[in-house]
């Protein structure tokens, strides 16, 4: 949704804002003053991205396209487990994407959902369970290969990081929410394992999470994650709401979010990468982000033909559910 390009990537969006304010205020002077004020505020509160050399160590180590195992490779092993991390390394992944959530007593653990029902033999919201209760659950209980992983437990963030470092894997920390808690927990992890500054990245669908992370530690490499129409439609394209007016409201919000992501929020947060749903990635799309000094990582790329296309034709790193075979995407 770029209007036109300039070196900083802000000419297009602020020209649009100026025109919009001209229409609303009907005063060239007021429109110029308001637009200038918004621009100065953005520049004042925005963060500089980390040096591109450091970011590329994570995104394209050894100057090659990276294959990142989604949730550790959720098709090949129980997702977000130490077994998944080990399998990802064994199967040739460059790195892993891991989801961070918190127990009721504030322990950061690996979990994608806000409930434990889908992946474990337990039930209930994770935020209502203590770490001691969570530790008793079996995260392999509902996996297709559960018999091959009988002794898995939900790992802590620290345990997962230690395992990844043992296998020389880059890490994409996917933060689901709790901006303050997550940024504090990750800051502690980065202080304990300073090598993470050069082989990991924090990413989120939520701009407030990334902004808080940059506030907490500006040396951390960050990325925004995005899927167009995510507020109004599920991952498989179905409308989220049956009521027409409600669905329409969220469609409008999706348009605003998409425009903000591509035109303002990337600059405000000072990101180094943009994680985009694969169906919206094209050579032209990559070129536009590259002009801003930002790498695109595509998700979720799950067939051999798609992987070959992203590696050979696009030269784009990608996230996949399986390093071994074709599989359906996990949203």
Swiss-Prot record:
Family matches, as InterPro entries: GP_PDE_dom, PLC-like_Pdiesterase_TIM-brl
Cofactor(s) in the UniProt record: Mg(2+)
Record-linked Gene3D superfamilies: Phosphatidylinositol (PI) phosphodiesterase
Sorted UniProt keywords: Cell membrane, Cytoplasmic vesicle, Glycoprotein, Hydrolase, Lipid metabolism, Magnesium, Membrane, Metal-binding, Transmembrane, Transmembrane helix
Any matching Pfam family: GDPD
Enzymatic reactions: sn-glycero-3-phospho-1D-myo-inositol + H2O = myo-inositol + sn-glycerol 3-phosphate + H(+); 1-O-(1Z-octadecenyl)-sn-glycero-3-phospho-(N-5Z,8Z,11Z,14Z-eicosatetraenoyl)-ethanolamine + H2O = 1-O-(1Z-octadecenyl)-sn-glycero-3-phosphate + N-(5Z,8Z,11Z,14Z-eicosatetraenoyl)-ethanolamine + H(+); 1-O-(1Z-octadecenyl)-sn-glycero-3-phospho-(N-9Z-octadecenoyl)-ethanolamine + H2O = 1-O-(1Z-octadecenyl)-sn-glycero-3-phosphate + N-(9Z-octadecenoyl) ethanolamine + H(+); 1-O-(1Z-octadecenyl)-sn-glycero-3-phospho-N-hexadecanoyl-ethanolamine + H2O = 1-O-(1Z-octadecenyl)-sn-glycero-3-phosphate + N-hexadecanoylethanolamine + H(+)
A GO biological process held by the record: ethanolamine metabolic process
Subcellular location: Cell membrane; Cytoplasmic vesicle membrane
Glycosylation sites: 168
Organs and tissues of expression: Detected in heart, brain, lung, liver, skeletal muscle, kidney, pituitary and testis.
Membrane topology: Multi-pass membrane protein
GO MF, one annotated term: phosphoric diester hydrolase activity
Regions of this protein lying in the Lumenal compartment: 25-248
Topological domain ranges for the Cytoplasmic compartment: 1-3, 270-331
GO CC annotations, alphabetized: cytoplasmic vesicle membrane; membrane; plasma membrane
tRNA processing among keywords: no
EC number: 3.1.4.44, 3.1.4.-
Chain sites annotated for binding Mg(2+): 97, 99, 174
Protein purpose: Hydrolyzes the phosphodiester bond of glycerophosphodiesters such as glycerophosphoinositol (GroPIns) and glycerophosphoethanolamine (GroPEth), to yield a glycerol phosphate and an alcohol. Hydrolyzes glycerophospho-N-acylethanolamines to N-acylethanolamines in the brain and participates in bioactive N-acylethanolamine biosynthesis such as anandamide (an endocannabinoid), N-palmitoylethanolamine (an anti-inflammatory), and N-oleoylethanolamine (an anorexic).
Name of the molecule in the record: Glycerophosphodiester phosphodiesterase 1
Organism for this UniProt entry: Rattus norvegicus
Lineage: Eukaryota, Metazoa, Chordata, Craniata, Vertebrata
Name of the gene: Gde1
């Amino acid at each position: 949704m770029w209007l036109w390009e300039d070196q900083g990537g802000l000419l297009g969006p602020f020209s649009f804002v100026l025109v919009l304010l001209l229409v609303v205020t009907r005063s060239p002077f007021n429109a110029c003053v308001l637009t200038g004020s918004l621009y100065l505020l953005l520049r004042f509160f925005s963060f500089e991205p980390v040096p591109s050399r450091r970011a590329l160590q994570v995104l394209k180590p050894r100057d090659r396209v990276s294959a990142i195992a989604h949730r550790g490779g959720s098709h090949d092993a129980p997702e977000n487990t130490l077994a998944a991390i080990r399998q990802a390394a064994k199967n040739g992944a460059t790195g892993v994407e891991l989801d961070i959530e918190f127990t009721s007593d504030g322990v950061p653990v690996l979990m994608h959902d806000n409930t434990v029902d889908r992946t474990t033999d337990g039930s209930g919201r994770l935020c209502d369970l203590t770490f001691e209760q969570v530790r008793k659950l079996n995260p392999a209980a509902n996996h297709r290969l559960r018999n091959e992983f009988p002794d898995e437990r939900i790992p802590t963030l620290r345990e997962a990081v230690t395992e990844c470092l043992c296998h020389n894997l880059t890490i994409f920390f996917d933060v689901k929410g709790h901006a303050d808690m997550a940024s504090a927990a990750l800051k502690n992890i980065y202080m304990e394992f300073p090598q993470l500054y050069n082989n990991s990245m924090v990413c989120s669908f939520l701009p407030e999470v990334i902004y808080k992370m940059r506030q907490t530690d500006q040396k951390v490499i960050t990325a925004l994650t995005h899927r167009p129409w995510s507020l109004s439609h599920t991952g498989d394209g179905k409308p989220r709401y049956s009521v027409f007016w409600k669905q329409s409201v969220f469609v409008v919000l999706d348009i605003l979010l998409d425009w903000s992501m591509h035109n303002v929020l990337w600059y405000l947060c000072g990101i180094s990468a943009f994680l985009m749903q694969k169906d919206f990635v094209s050579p032209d799309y990559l070129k536009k982000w590259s002009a801003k000094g930002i790498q695109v990582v595509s998700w979720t790329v799950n067939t051999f033909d798609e992987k070959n296309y992203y590696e050979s034709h696009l030269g784009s790193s990608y996230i996949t559910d399986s390093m071994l075979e074709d599989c359906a995407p996990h949203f």
